[in-house]
Amino acid sequence: NMYLPPVPPPPVVPTF
């Protein structure tokens, strides 16, 4: 398995 660095979470879109 290749090393995968931590991925930042996707941007959260606020729902109104």
From Swiss-Prot:
It is found in: Secreted, Cell wall. The keyword Secreted applies. It comes from the Eukaryota. The modification 4-hydroxyproline is found at P6, P8, P9, P10, P11. GO terms for cellular component: extracellular region. Keywords: Cell wall, Hydroxylation, Secreted. The keyword Acyltransferase does not apply. Its main location: secreted. This is 230 kDa cell wall protein. It comes from Phaseolus vulgaris. The lineage of its organism: Eukaryota, Viridiplantae, Streptophyta, Embryophyta, Tracheophyta.
